[in-house]
């Protein structure tokens, strides 16, 4: 009989499997109580259903409040919006997927290898586990939620909210966000992990972790060569590591680290652990509650603090120095050594034999636990103490401290306080003991002791003990022939006196225990008065709290009190009278003894072989011997037992919970009541009459007799058919007689039907079981929840009904006409057989090796055939499932609607018929032969599976992929899949073929509701036909043949379709999105309608009249569209869609709905240097949209739109702009022709840039042309008949070139204008020998340029320099040098922003005399970095960069007059000159220009008026200035595209008005500021400002 079962999850098959150990021996079960494991039931509950094709679960709830507790998702299965409550579980196996799952408290989700879970929410108490190879995406972990990811598992896009738990290691792959930001684990490296509330990260050998945060309840494990740096260990966070790892971070004590075998400042708490390896060390460690430090041999720890519930272990060869043990802290020294340990109150130091602890400081309340084999030294409150060489001195034992003095060893001056303990073994010696209250001494009279206790002096010497105090765990053992006097036994103390020993003058206080027998001699007092034992007579003994008295035969005891924990044992022939048996007191005796006394039931006695009213509890025992009797016995708890021996009898016995009555052969029991937890055993030859079995009670009868039984509900009977039984149960009368059992009720009980015997009409309820042995039989058995039936080899059962929770195990036996209802299970073991079984919904049958099932009907239930098992003539109806596992087989199976057969790895099936709605599913290494698929049936063959000699009738579906092996016939002939190639497959009515990477499919037909799925790298060959609503799917499909859509009513493809093949559509409607490229092109005929939606297409299209092609929602088609000999099809371009022409094209009706037709070269032709115009011929045009066109106005060629018929609508011509110059700007270029209609065309931006000039669109009749002049004629010439020629406009590029040609003049002059003020600083500091100065300048100038150009110049810059002043008697001369830089932004009036960076430097000299005359001269050189930026009319950006050099200077003369004491006036004359070099300019739009030498010459006359003020000791000089300047340069030349000359005339007069102030802050430092306004013929500067400083030497 298989008695021990284990269930093991098999990762490869994705299911639970059952393993067993054979325990049956000799063909018959041993006759003893059994609690058989319900292995089949467990297997059935844990065994998930095998995957069916594409099972989709939506809005399911599992667990509490739901109808189902579990869900298994296998290959192809999906589950969406699942809620998993308490007790619910979801397992996602390989190929299965779960989306939008919510896991609540007590719910579980398991994602196995190959399974996936997306968008999971884990609430408090919920659990998600991702196994190796499994994946989870977008998991949200709320507070208390738990995510576990095994090594090799993947979880990405995690949201870990506060309190959410992650448990993983560095072999896993994770990413997501937590309250600290983004975190990840990849390639063995973990970053920014948050561990809290049970979170766990294991950093494996050679891996690493950075920026880990460990909050309370979090756990970080780092061992070996692993490393973890930048750790934040908050309070309650745990680290487990060893000193071979590398760690660094901060804890509440500051920075900590482990490096090079050295650990510093570690905090160990809440399961944290540090292993200090050999040769390594740890310093400044703090061990809090739950923390552990282990110091191996050769390792060391220094400055360790051990707090409450912290532990330090020092092993052999290890050492610990300067350890502090606080209250609740523990240090264990086992063969190692500890030095300088301080034990504070409540601290605990344990030193094992062979361990060493020296320089101990034992403070008051500190505990030391050791023995005299250890070595110790230190100080306590009594001074120095030590243990060495087996001798202990001055030890203090308290608060859990303990000293064991071994035989031959000694202890002197020992103090034992409350909670301390001293044990002295026989032959050991302890003298000068001080035993204070609560201190415990344990010894026997072979030891030698002396000392004082609260009673005075005590001693043990030469086998004599005197004045001993026993309490709080203390004990004294008086050996035979030894004696003890004046012993006091308090609560918790114990005195044991052997036979022949003597103890007198005993004081036994409440709770004190005496253990002895009537051969000893005792005297003393207890709470009942005087007691004694002498000459085999005991009087007034008190037995409690472990006390024991044995009264031997012929001896006696009187007035014995037995309290809880006390035992009185009276041997046969012994006498004990006047017993008081209180609750919990134990009597152990037999009916040969003589007893009398009282218990809680009243008076009891045993006399003359008759026992009456005995109470057996707390392990008490009564033997009823032959010829004797027991009446009115009560048997209570703790296996209290009555044995009724042969010839004995028991009457009116009550057996309560934990009580036992055994009736041996020849014994008898009458009128027994068995209550819950009570047990009565009737052995062979024994008898029981009138037994009542109440709920929870148990009667066991093997070969014995029990009659007149009353079996109440919940009462258990265990028997075999060799027994004789009769009685009544809830079903009526029952009996066992002559090997026949009838109407038995088994609940928690068992019935063993032996060979040749039988059982009929048996009911088996929860906990009940029936075993049918070899040649035994059972008929009409009903098995309910928790009931079990076992049928051994050659045993047989017939007409069995198995309800929910019931289980039948055929151990080589047979079962006929069994019905398995919901939740019922049958296991058919080797050599077993089941015939005519009906498996209803929820029922389950499993066939093991060498077992078989025949003529089975499965109505919604399941049958599983394991290795070596077989099933024949099986019919599966709706909801029925048959699983053929490795080595299992099935023959002649019929699958009706809703029935499913699953062939797993190594399973084989022959002669299956699949009717409509039925399904056969073949998994890897599964094999089927001679399967017939009728209309509506489905055959699914997974990768690695095989199916041969298949007959696929019309309407039959095949679901498979190119890694399977198939062969058979269909309507087209022979089909096959082998070696990754599929040929002549027919897919309809749910059929699916998946073409895997590197595989191909030839001549496939996809009919109604069929699907052809092509993975990236899969190839289609031959003719692939999609008819009716057949579907093609795939992210990337390669077509090397002809992809033929034949009258497909609604074909939709989303993905990438490429290859050298062709796409043909005959009739029907198709929609394509993604990417499409077919070298053989696309052909539309017979009214075909193709819509491209968000598609990138690259193919030439041939259309037939009556067909239509639509581009929608941003689609892009690159290729020619042409008609055939019947004409051309219609074309529509909608929304943001674009049609790129790669050549001349012809369409029927062209409709633009905000779409674009692009004549410009595509990416594939853009590298072609020579421009080739393209023409588009359309029969008609309507709608609105854009035509992007190319022109080469320079060669007078361009693209052409030719509408032969009617054109209506509004269209924009987006014609590419250029900077190149046409040959002739006056010749029109035709771009559009229409046959008729009112279509309106306009240019994008209203014009086209071509070189220097802008071109405009002009209409002539139904043709449209590009011309260089505007569409409006010029104005009339007064007095003539000739109008003024139309106006031409320069392009923005030309304007920008003209702007940039003049910019250096204004930049230079502005810098020079600011520079002139520096001479005033020199003149103000007449006594200074020189100095340094600096100033910042800023301006905003609006400038008019040549040919209508203009711009704004914004300048900001700085200048700095220094000079030396020479004294020339009546005058002075300042000579200096300077450098400058300015950043100049140019905003062109017609668009664009250019920049000029100006870097310069120069020399200056200023002469001035005492009469106020001055002359100032400057020479300056500049380098200009010019960056031109503008746009053409079509919005195309234009740029050109170049550098330019320039130089110039100024000369100024004037005189300062004093009008009065504080007022002065300064008239002056100034001239400036500048010249910038000629420069060739090239723009990236093809425009070229030559800026000639740019010149400037200015004259200026002006006056400054100011005052000198003394403000708080500081000289402040406010002033006003006005001047008139004239520019003389009017002929700066610019030539564009070597075709057109332009003149930049910058001449004109400018007025200047300003105000400023300077201040001499100290004798050596001054500052100034000025603002001015300038306005002239070509310029206006609303504001120009400067600020500066000077520091004198």
Curated annotation (Swiss-Prot):
- Which residues, by range, are in coiled-coil regions? none
Superkingdom of the source species: Bacteria
Instruction: Describe PTMs of this protein.
Output: Glycosylated by heptosyltransferas BAHTCr. Glycosylation is required for adhesion to mammalian cells and colonization of the mouse host gastrointestinal tract.
Q: Name one Pfam family in it.
A: Pertactin
Protein's recorded name? Autotransporter CRAC
The organism's taxonomy opens as: Bacteria, Pseudomonadati, Pseudomonadota, Gammaproteobacteria, Enterobacterales
Q: Which UniProt keywords apply?
A: Cell outer membrane, Glycoprotein, Membrane, Plasmid, Signal, Transmembrane, Transmembrane beta strand, Virulence
What species does this protein belong to?
Citrobacter rodentium (strain ICC168)
* Disordered, as annotated region: 65-100, 1267-1286
Question: What residues does the Autotransporter domain cover?
Answer: 1325-1593
């Amino acid at each position: 009989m298989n008695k021990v079962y284990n269930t093991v999850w098999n990762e490869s098959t994705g299911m639970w499997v059952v393993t067993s150990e054979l325990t049956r021996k000799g063909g018959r079960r041993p006759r003893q109580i059994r609690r058989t494991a319900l292995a089949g039931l467990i297997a059935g509950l844990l065994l998930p259903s095998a995957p069916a094709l594409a099972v989709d679960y939506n809005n399911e709830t599992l667990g509490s409040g739901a109808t189902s507790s579990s869900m298994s998702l296998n290959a192809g299965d999906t589950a969406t919006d699942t809620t998993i409550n308490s007790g619910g579980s979801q397992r996602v196996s390989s190929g299965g997927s779960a989306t939008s799952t919510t896991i609540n408290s007590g719910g579980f989700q398991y994602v196995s290898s190959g399974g996936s879970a997306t968008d999971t929410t884990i609430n408090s108490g919920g659990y998600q586990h991702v196994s190796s190879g499994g994946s989870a995406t977008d998991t949200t972990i709320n507070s208390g939620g738990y995510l576990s990811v095994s090594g090799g598992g993947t979880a990405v896009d995690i949201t870990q909210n506060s309190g959410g738990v992650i448990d993983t290691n560095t072999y896993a792959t994770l990413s997501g966000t937590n309250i600290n930001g983004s975190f990840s684990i990849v390639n063995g490296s973990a970053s920014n992990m948050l561990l809290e509330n049970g979170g766990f990260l294991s950093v494996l050998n050679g891996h690493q972790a950075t920026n880990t945060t460990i909050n309370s309840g979090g756990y970080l494990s780092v061992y070996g060569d692993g490393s973890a740096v930048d750790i934040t260990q908050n309070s309650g966070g745990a680290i487990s590591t060893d000193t071979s790892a590398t760690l660094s971070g901060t804890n509440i004590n500051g920075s900590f680290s482990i490096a090079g075998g050295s650990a510093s400042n570690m905090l160990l708490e809440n399961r944290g652990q540090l292993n200090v390896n050999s040769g390594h060390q740890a310093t400044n460690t703090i061990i809090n509650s739950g923390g552990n430090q282990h110091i191996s041999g050769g390792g060391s720890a220094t400055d360790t603090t051990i707090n409450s519930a912290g532990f330090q272990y020092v092993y052999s060869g290890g050492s610990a120095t300067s350890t502090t043990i606080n209250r609740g802290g523990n240090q264990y020294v086992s063969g190692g050594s500890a030095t300088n340990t301080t034990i504070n109150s409540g601290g605990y130091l344990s030193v094992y034999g062979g361990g060493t602890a020296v320089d101990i400081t034992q403070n008051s309340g500190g505990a030391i636990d050791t023995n005299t084999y250890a070595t110790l030294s230190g100080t306590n409150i009594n001074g120095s103490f030590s243990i060495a060489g087996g001798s202990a001195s001055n030890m203090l034992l308290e608060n859990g401290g303990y000293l064991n003095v071994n035989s031959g060893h000694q202890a002197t001056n020992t103090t034992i306080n409350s909670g301390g303990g001293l044990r002295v073994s026989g032959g050991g010696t302890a003298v000068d003991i001080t035993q204070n209250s609560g201190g415990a001494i344990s010894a026997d009279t072979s030891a030698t002791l002396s000392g004082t206790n609260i009673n005075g002096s005590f001693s043990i010497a030469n086998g004599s003990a005197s004045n001993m105090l026993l309490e709080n765990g203390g004990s004294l053992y008086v050996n035979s022939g030894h004696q003890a006097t004046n012993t006091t036994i308090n609560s918790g103390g114990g005195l044991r006196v052997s036979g022949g020993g003597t103890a007198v003058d005993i004081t036994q206080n409440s709770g004190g225990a005496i253990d002895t027998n009537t051969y000893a001699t005792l005297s003393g007092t207890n709470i009942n008065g005087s007691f004694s034992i002498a000459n085999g007579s005991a009087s007034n003994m008190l037995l409690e709290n472990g006390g024991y008295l044995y009264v031997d035969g012929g001896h006696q005891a009187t007035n014995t009190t037995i309290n809880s924990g006390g035992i009185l044992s009276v041997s046969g022939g012994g006498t004990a009278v006047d017993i008081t048996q209180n609750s919990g007191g134990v009597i152990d005796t037999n009916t040969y003894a003589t007893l009398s006394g009282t218990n809680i039931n009243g008076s009891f006695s045993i006399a003359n072989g008759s026992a009456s009213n005995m109470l057996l509890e707390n392990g008490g025992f009564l033997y009823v011997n032959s010829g004797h009797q027991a009446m009115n016995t009560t048997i209570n708890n703790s296996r209290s037992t009555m044995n009724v021996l042969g010839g004995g009898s028991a009457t009116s016995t009550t057996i309560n919970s934990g009580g036992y009555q055994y009736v041996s052969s020849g014994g008898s029991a009458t009128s027994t009541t068995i209550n819950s937890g009570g047990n009565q055993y009737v052995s062979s030859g024994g008898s029981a009459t009138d037994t009542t079995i109440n709920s929870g009670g148990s009667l066991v009868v093997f070969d014995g007799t029990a009659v007149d039984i009353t079996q109440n509900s919940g009462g258990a009977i265990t028997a075999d058919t060799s027994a004789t039984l009769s009685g009544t149960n809830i079903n009526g009368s029952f009996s066992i007689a002559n090997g026949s059992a009838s109407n038995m009720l088994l609940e928690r009980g068992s019935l063993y039907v032996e060979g040749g015997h039988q059982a009929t009409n048996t009911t088996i309820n929860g906990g009940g079981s029936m075993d049918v042995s070899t040649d035994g039989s059972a008929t009409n058995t009903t098995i309910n929840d928790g009931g079990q039936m076992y049928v051994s080899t050659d045993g047989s059962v017939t007409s069995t009904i198995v309800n929910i929770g019931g289980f039948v195990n055929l151990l080589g036996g047979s079962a006929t006409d069994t019905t398995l209802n919901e939740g019922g299970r049958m296991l058919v073991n080797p050599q077993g057989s089941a015939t005519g079984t009906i498996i209803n919904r929820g029922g389950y049958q499993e066939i093991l090796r060498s077992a078989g099932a025949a003529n089975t009907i499965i109505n919604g239930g399941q049958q599983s055939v394991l290795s070596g098992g077989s099933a024949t003539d099986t019919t599966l109806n709706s909801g029925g499932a048959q699983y053929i596992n490795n080595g299992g087989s099935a023959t002649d199976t019929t699958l009706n609607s809703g029935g499913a057969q699953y062939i797993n790895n190594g399973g084989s099936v022959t002669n299956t018929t699949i009717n409509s709605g039925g399904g056969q599913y073949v998994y890897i290494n599964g094999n089927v032969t001679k399967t017939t698929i009728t209309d509506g049936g489905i055959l699914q063959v997974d990768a690695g599976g095989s199916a041969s000699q298949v007959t696929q009738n019309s309407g039959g579906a095949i679901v498979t992929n190119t890694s399977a092996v198939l062969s058979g016939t269909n309507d087209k002939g022979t089909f096959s899949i082998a070696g990754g190639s599929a040929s002549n497959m027919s897919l309809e009515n749910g059929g699916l073929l998946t073409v895997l990477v590197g595989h191909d499919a030839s001549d496939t037909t996809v009919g109604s509701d069929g699907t052809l799925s092509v993975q990236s790298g899969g190839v289609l060959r031959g003719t692939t036909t999609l008819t009716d609503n057949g579907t093609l799917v795939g992210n990337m499909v390669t077509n090397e043949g002809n992809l033929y859509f034949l009258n497909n009513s609604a074909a939709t493809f989303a993905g990438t379709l490429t290859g050298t093949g062709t796409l043909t559509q005959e009739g029907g409607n198709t929609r394509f999105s993604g990417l499409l490229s077919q070298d053989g092109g696309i052909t539309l005929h017979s009214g075909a309608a193709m819509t491209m939606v968000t598609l990138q297409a690259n193919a030439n299209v041939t259309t037939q009249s009556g067909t239509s092609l639509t581009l929608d929602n941003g689609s892009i088609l690159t290729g020619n569209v042409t008609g055939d000999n019947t004409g051309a099809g219609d074309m529509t371009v909608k929304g943001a869609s674009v049609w790129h022409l790669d050549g001349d094209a012809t369409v029927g009706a062209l409709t633009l709905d905000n779409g674009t037709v692009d004549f410009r070269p595509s990416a594939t032709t853009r590298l072609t240097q020579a421009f080739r115009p393209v023409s588009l011929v359309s029969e008609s045009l309507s709608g609105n949209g854009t035509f992007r066109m190319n022109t080469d106005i320079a060669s007078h060629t361009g693209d052409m739109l030719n509408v032969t018929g009617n054109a209506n609508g509004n269209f924009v011509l987006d014609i590419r702009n250029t900077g190149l110059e046409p040959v002739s700007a006056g010749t029109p270029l035709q771009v559009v022709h229409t046959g008729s209609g009112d279509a309106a065309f306009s240019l994008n931006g209203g014009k086209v840039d071509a070189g220097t000039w802008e071109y405009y669109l002009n209409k002539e009749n139904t043709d449209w042309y590009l011309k260089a002049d505007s569409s409006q004629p010029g104005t009339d010439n007064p007095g003539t008949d000739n109008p003024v020629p139309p106006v031409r406009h320069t392009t923005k590029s030309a304007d920008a070139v003209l702007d940039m040609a003049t910019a250096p003049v204004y930049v230079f002059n502005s810098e020079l204008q600011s520079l002139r003020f520096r001479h005033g600083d020199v003149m103000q500091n007449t006594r200074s020998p020189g100095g340094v100065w600096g100033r910042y300048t800023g301006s905003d100038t609006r400038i008019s340029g040549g040919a209508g150009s203009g711009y704004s110049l914004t300048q900001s810059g700085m200048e700095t320099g220094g000079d030396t002043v020479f004294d020339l008697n009546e005058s002075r001369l300042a000579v200096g040098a300077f450098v400058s830089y300015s950043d100049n932004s140019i905003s062109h009036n017609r668009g664009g922003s250019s920049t000029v960076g100006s870097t310069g430097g120069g020399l200056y000299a200023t002469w001035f005399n005492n009469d106020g005359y001055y002359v100032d001269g400057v020479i300056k050189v500049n380098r200009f970095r010019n960056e031109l930026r503008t746009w053409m009319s079509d919005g195309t950006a234009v740029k050109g960069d170049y550098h330019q050099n320039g130089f110039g200077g100024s000369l100024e003369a004037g005189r300062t007059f004093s009008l009065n004491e504080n007022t002065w006036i300064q008239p002056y004359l100034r001239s400036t000159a500048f010249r910038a070099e000629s420069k060739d300019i090239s723009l990236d739009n093809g425009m070229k220009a030559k800026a000639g030498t740019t010149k400037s010459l200015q004259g200026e006359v002006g006056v400054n008026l100011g005052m000198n003020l003394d403000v708080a000791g500081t000289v402040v000089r406010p002033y006003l200035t006005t001047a008139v300047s004239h520019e003389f340069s009017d002929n700066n030349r610019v030539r564009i595209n070597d075709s057109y000359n332009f003149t930049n005339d910058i001449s004109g007069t400018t007025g200047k008005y300003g105000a400023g102030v300077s201040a001499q802050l100290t004798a050596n430092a001054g500052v100034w500021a000025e603002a001015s306004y300038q306005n002239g013929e070509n310029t206006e500067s609303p504001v120009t400002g400067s600020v500066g400083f000077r520091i004198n030497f």
